[in-house]
């Protein structure tokens, strides 16, 4: 396929670096979830998804949330993003109320960017056009600035050679990396990742894990990460929040005392296996409760 060459720009590279470098404001991003309750349905036919859920997501750290399927993890993520309302309680970002009394649904905004399970790249746009799209549409960057910043960020992520490709022409793993790069183009305070690597094979997933940690080490953005993969949770997270079966609330919070930067050699260490065993035991206990509750509901 013959493609028209993309425009090139002559802006000094120092200015491009200034566009890419994280700002002082962007380095914040503490989320505080306080006594959050979410009930779906009516009083006569309701589902109690989240109940008195309280925990913090520290700024500039990776917090991974695990728990039985259907326990309410994604409900919390959607409330933070502004996609769903809460019933009561409050959620704060850097001590500013996102949702709570008088405003039960947060306003979506570029300070909180979601990377979905199934991806959301525009198939008719090239990689650089996808990456540059957000800041251009919001009017925060001109087309020239957005393309310059996008190229610099793709280069940092090892994706420089893909900018003229379309999403359907690259692997699923590469598309995931492009989506995260596109999210970071908006200079968010928080990345909200909902099982982003669920559909990947184990080898590709391991490469994506290390790529995400490299991205985190460069940007220090707060990451709220949902997964069912417990090994993934321990490898990536500074903290792992283990949720109860529905209604969702923290059962246990682990601080993963394994220094960053991490690589896959940590998976064979005794400390890693101890964290994993503790997590498996807690999640398994809740999964049994979820199964028993499902049997009773039949």
Predicted regions and their residues:
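Short helical segment in ABC ATPase nucleotide-binding domains corresponding to the A-loop/adjacent helical element
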Residues: 128-137, 147, 151, 255
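Conserved signature/switch motifs of ABC ATPase nucleotide-binding domains
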Residues: 165-168, 186
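ABC ATPase nucleotide-binding domain "signature" region
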Residues: 64, 114, 178-183, 187
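ABC ATPase NBD coupling module
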Residues: 42-44, 98-116, 137, 143-147, ...
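Conserved ABC transporter NBD signature motif
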Residues: 89-100
